[in-house]
Design a protein with these regions (language model features):
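Bacterial Sec-dependent N-terminal signal peptides
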Residues: 1-21
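Short amphipathic alpha-helical segments and helix-helix/interface helices
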Residues: 170, 228, 375, 422, ...
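Active-site-proximal structural scaffolding
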Residues: 146, 166, 281, 319, ...
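Conserved, mostly hydrophobic/aromatic
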Residues: 153, 378, 467
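N-terminal accessory beta-strand-rich subdomains and adjacent acidic, glycine-rich linkers
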Residues: 22-315
Length: 497
C-alpha cells in the first residue's frame, strides 16, 4: 500500500543527439553517466564517492532470427537473410531521441517484513532510443537511489516491434578491479551450492570443485555465477549485483569475461534454447547494483523491494502471516525414517496400486502417532505450525523417473489420518502446513492444483510448502526459466484465490 507521496518532478532535457546524460543520487554520493558510443551502443558507468563501481559498460539485447511472415515452405533468399540479421540487433545503431529526468520520494507499507514503512526515494533518467536501420524504439529507464542503481529495458508497442524472441540479453557490468567475490556456480536448475570466496580471476580455476552433485543441475560456464553476487573491492567498497521485479522473464545469471573483468547478463533458456518470448508493450526485470562502503548497508538496502511491483492481492495483509514451524523431514534425510510407506513397490500407478495389500516398511515417518509427537513438541516450544513430508501416496518411485503422474496431492497413506491429525493439532493451538512435492512434474501439479488447494481448505491447512526436486516436466524446461517463473506466480495467484 503506497502512501505519503512527497515529490514528483519531471524535466524533459534538451539534448544533442548522443550527448552524455548524468544522473545523481538524492544524497549526491552516486553518479551515473549514460551515453551512446560511436557504434550507437547504449553505455553507462557508475561512481560512488569518487570511486569507480562500474566502468563504461554496454547495454542491449540480441533477438532470435525469425520471419513471422513466412511459412516453412517459402523460398528463402540470401538478401532476406541479411535483412533478418539486422533485425536481431537491439544493441547498437541507436541514437538518443529524448531523455527525461524525474525525482520520486514516498514511504509505503509492505504486507509484512522487517520494517513497518519503507522509503522509496530516487532520481530517474528515462532515455528514449531510436534505431533508424530497423525503425524501432526502446527505452532504458535508470533509477538511482542513495544505495545503488536499477535499470531496465522497455519496449513500446510499435509497428516494427510487436512479438519477438530474446536470444541473449547483453547487459554488462564492467568491474574496476579483480574483486573478492562471494559466489556460487551459475546453474539453470539449482542454487544448492556452498559459497566460494575468491578473486574474480580465480573463479575459472575453482569452478569444477564448486559444482557439487545435486538432484537437478545445469551449470553453463566455467566463469558463470548466480545473482545475488556479493563483492568486496580493495579500496573498501561492497558491491552487489542482482535483479528485481522478475515477472514473465527468465532469471538472470552472470557470465564473467575474466580477462577484462566484465560481467554480462546470462538468461536461463527454455527447452528450445530461447531466452524469452515477448510482446510489446513490455519490459524486462530491473538489473540492480547496490553499493556502499559499509557492508551493513548492503543488507539494509531496500532497492529490491522498491523496484518490485506492488502487491496485487488486495487483502494480503489480512492473511499473509510469518510463522515458525518444525516438520517431519529431517529423519528421512538422515536415513532414520522414510518418505515411502512400503518397500515392496518399485513402481506405483496412482488409482491402481492398492496400498492395503502391501506390507508397511515400519519406518514411514509421516504416520499419525509420530506427527502427534511433533505437534506436542511444537506446542510446548513456541512453534506455530508443523510440516509433514511423505504423507501422500506415490513416494515409492517419486524421483529419477521423469514421471508425469507422480502425485495427486489429496490421497494420504493408510497410516496418515488427515482428520485426526487436524483435530489434534487444533486442540493444541497448532496449524498443519501442507507439503506438495511435485517431483518437478509441473504439468501434473497444475492439473491437480484446484483439487489440492481445496483439499487444504477442507482439512484446515492454511499454508503450503511446494517442492520441485528433479528435472522439470515439461521436459527440457529449467527451474529458473521464463516458463517456470510464470508457473510460480500462477501457484501464488491460485493460492490467493
Amino acid at each position: 500500500m503506497k502512501k505519503n507521496l512527497l515529490l514528483i518532478a519531471i524535466l524533459c532535457i534538451p539534448f544533442i543527439a548522443n550527448a552524455q546524460q548524468k544522473l545523481t543520487s538524492p544524497d549526491g554520493n552516486l553518479v551515473m553517466t549514460f551515453q551512446v558510443n560511436k557504434e550507437g551502443a547504449p553505455t553507462y558507468d557508475l561512481i560512488y564517492k569518487g570511486k569507480t563501481v562500474i566502468k563504461p559498460s554496454t547495454l542491449g539485447l540480441e533477438l532470435k532470427k525469425e520471419d513471422n511472415t513466412r511459412t516453412d515452405f517459402d523460398w528463402v533468399d540470401r538478401r532476406d537473410l541479411t535483412k533478418l540479421d539486422s533485425k536481431t540487433n537491439l544493441y547498437n545503431g541507436f541514437e538518443v531521441k529524448d531523455a527525461k529526468t524525474s525525482t520520486f520520494n514516498e514511504t509505503w507499507q509492505p504486507v509484512w517484513g522487517e520494517e513497518k514503512e519503507i522509503r522509496n526515494h530516487y532520481n530517474e533518467l528515462a532515455v528514449n532510443l531510436y534505431q533508424p536501420m530497423n525503425d524501432r524504439s526502446i527505452l532504458i529507464r535508470f533509477r538511482l537511489f542513495n544505495d545503488g542503481l536499477g535499470f531496465r529495458y522497455e519496449f513500446p508497442q510499435q509497428k516494427s516491434l510487436n512479438y519477438f524472441i530474446i536470444k541473449e540479453e547483453h547487459s554488462q557490468f564492467a568491474m574496476a578491479g579483480d574483486h573478492i567475490a562471494y559466489w556460487i556456480p551459475g546453474d539453470y536448475d539449482t542454487q544448492e551450492y556452498d559459497y566460494t570466496i575468491s578473486r574474480l580471476s580465480e573463479i575459472r580455476g575453482l569452478m569444477k570443485e564448486a559444482i557439487t552433485p545435486n538432484s537437478s543441475q545445469t551449470p553453463f560456464s566455467q566463469t558463470g555465477v548466480q545473482t545475488a553476487l556479493m563483492m568486496k573491492t580493495d579500496d573498501g567498497l561492497y558491491i552487489n549485483l542482482h535483479e528485481a521485479a522478475l515477472i514473465d522473464y527468465s532469471c538472470m545469471h552472470l557470465n564473467l569475461d575474466d580477462k577484462n573483468m566484465v560481467f554480462e547478463s546470462w538468461l536461463t533458456p527454455d527447452a528450445k534454447g530461447d531466452k524469452g518470448y515477448m510482446q510489446t508493450p513490455s519490459h524486462t526485470p530491473w538489473r540492480t547494483v547496490i553499493v556502499s562502503d559499509d557492508a551493513r548497508n548492503i543488507l539494509a538496502s531496500r532497492i529490491t523491494l522498491n523496484l518490485n511491483e506492488p502487491c496485487k492481492i488486495a487483502d494480503a495483509a489480512s492473511w499473509v502471516k510469518p510463522v515458525k514451524y518444525i516438520g517431519v523431514w529431517w529423519d528421512m534425510i538422515t536415513g532414520k525414517g522414510s518418505w515411502a510407506y512400503t518397500d515392496e513397490l518399485t513402481s506405483v500407478k496412482l488409482g491402481e496400486t492398492d496400498y492395503s495389500k502391501t506390507k508397511p516398511n515400519g519406518k514411514h515417518s509421516a504416520n499419525t502417532a509420530n506427527v502427534k509427537r511433533y505437534i506436542d513438541f511444537a506446542a510446548a516450544n513456541g512453534f506455530d505450525a508443523v510440516l509433514v513430508e511423505g504423507w501422500n501416496e506415490g513416494w515409492e518411485d517419486w524421483f529419477g523417473n521423469s514421471k508425469d503422474y507422480v502425485f495427486d496431492f489429496v490421497t494420504p497413506y493408510p497410516d496418515f489420518d488427515v482428520k485426526e491429525i487436524h483435530r489434534y493439532a487444533a486442540s493444541k493451538g497448532i496449524k498443519m502446513m501442507m507439503h506438495h512435492e511435485t517431483s518437478a512434474s509441473v504439468r501434473n501439479y497444475e492439473r491437480h492444483m484446484d483439487k489440492a488447494y481445496q483439499f487444504m481448505v477442507d482439512n484446515g491447512y492454511t499454508s503450503v510448502k511446494s517442492g520441485y526436486v528433479g528435472n522439470i516436466i515439461p521436459r527440457g524446461e529449467h527451474h529458473y526459466g521464463q516458463w517456470m517463473n510464470n508457473h510460480y506466480l500462477y501457484a501464488v495467484t491460485k493460492a490467493a484465490d
